[in-house]
Amino acid sequence: MSSNPLRFFVLTIFPHIISCYSEYGIVKQAIKKGKVEVYPIDLREFAPKGQVDDVPYGGLPGMVLKPEPIYEAYDYVVENYGKPFVLITEPWGEKLNQKLVNELSKKERIMIICGRYEGVDERVKKIVDMEISLGDFILSGGEIVALAVIDAVSRVLPGVLSEPQSIQEDSFQNRWLGYPVYTRPREYRGMKVPEELLSGHHKLIELWKLWHRIENTVKKRPDLIPKDLTELEKDILNSILSGKSFKEWLKEHKHLL
């Protein structure tokens, strides 16, 4: 992967939404470490008299983002930074998931065109590489989608997180969903931290985490259960489906400790 920072160019009529978010959390950390650069591009600066929208042909209600400001902004980026991989936010676009995030993290330049109003003039699609969405619902604009892309991609770039293991522990990055997490105090209002996590027994903790990852996936997202299971995963999955608890299963598998 290139040692150069991954550059995000966000075409929007609300650039402050992007610049504000870039001052916090993982994105700020990625920028500070030189792994990411975020450029909010105000479409009004590329529009004659600042007009970025107009009425749609065909008598539909609402307004549509004009093609000229977007093409002008695109040309500016190409001339000054090089050709980017272009995303446009659309409700019917490909849903953002961890696999796509990992693919995007390998790009050098990503442009995100934020939709608004009734949409973007279809002629803009000529420069678009991918339509992208967060799900089957409507947002007021694409800025939230753009921020999700920037945040998710930034955190998987090598060197951004201070603890790289955190990435592998993430739901969706791992084969299974995440496991329950706990912190101090050990007991609160009668609710105790599982004794396995306090044991200091690394293999026991590892098995506990795997069991609860699989259990979490079975209960919350059974559609994500992998098909290529290891023998241990098959054993745990079948035990969960049969109604066994972790402690019951562990009694039968003490040889794993």
Swiss-Prot record:
GO terms for cellular component: cytosol. The keyword Manganese does not apply. It is an enzyme of class 2 (transferase). S-adenosyl-L-methionine binds at G115, L134, G135, D136, F137, I138, L139. It catalyses: guanosine(37) in tRNA + S-adenosyl-L-methionine = N(1)-methylguanosine(37) in tRNA + S-adenosyl-L-homocysteine + H(+). Keywords: Cytoplasm, Methyltransferase, S-adenosyl-L-methionine, Transferase, tRNA processing. Signal peptide: none annotated. Its EC number is 2.1.1.228. It comes from the Bacteria. It is found in: Cytoplasm. GO terms for biological process: tRNA N1-guanine methylation. The keyword Methyltransferase applies. GO terms for molecular function: tRNA (guanine(37)-N1)-methyltransferase activity. Specifically methylates guanosine-37 in various tRNAs. PANTHER family: TRNA (GUANINE-N(1)-)-METHYLTRANSFERASE (PTHR46417:SF1). Belongs to the RNA methyltransferase TrmD family. This is tRNA (guanine-N(1)-)-methyltransferase.
